[in-house]
């Protein structure tokens, strides 16, 4: 593996990982990408759980989603990058806001946040989330993505299905005027999701944060001004 150093122009040299005999080429590409990603390095420096934290930071800077005292749900929260940012910005745990993270996987504790393990689609788990919030949610976040299959059309359909389920949950817990943010992949199958969001929210916009990798098809739908669940 090449060492990171400084050239004559003080520009950092790229780190390059060689192809180990037992390592798949895709794994080597992932390692090279991680080692040369400035958001990965900055997340490590700041103590964020993942580089995804910067995506929420950038979305918040653009859309002003997080405010002190808010009640926030983070669906699919593990490892906790978005939950960290939300808890810090709403003042969770300081007798003000409340942030509840839920995931099928366990996540290490985050100061000020309540982390639950389970499936938000399960009625009993949904009730646990409501109880932990202590009232209607102001914001529901979803950075969820199903494991990639390598087939773009399949991955698109799977993430749209997750976003639709997250929307259904949000419609059940949001207060009037609340907001919903979810990751989707571009691909054309999100028409029904967007139609439902436009009925339920005053504003529906798309954004791709700078922290999203350029080659990724991911984008985020930002819906604000919740008016109530769309009519069947």
Which residue ranges define each predicted feature?
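Class I SAM-dependent methyltransferase Rossmann-like catalytic core
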Residues: 2-68
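Glycine-rich helix-loop-beta junction characteristic of Rossmann-like nucleotide cofactor-binding loops
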Residues: 61-67, 133-134, 172-173
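Conserved class I S-adenosyl-L-methionine
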Residues: 68-78
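Conserved SAM-binding loop of SAM-dependent methyltransferases across substrates and taxa
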Residues: 79-93
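Short glycine-dipeptide loop
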Residues: 93-96, 174-179
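S-adenosyl-L-methionine
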Residues: 96, 102-149
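A short glycine-rich, Lys/Arg-flanked "PGG" loop and its adjoining helix->strand segment in the class I
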Residues: 160-176
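Class I S-adenosyl-L-methionine
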Residues: 186-232
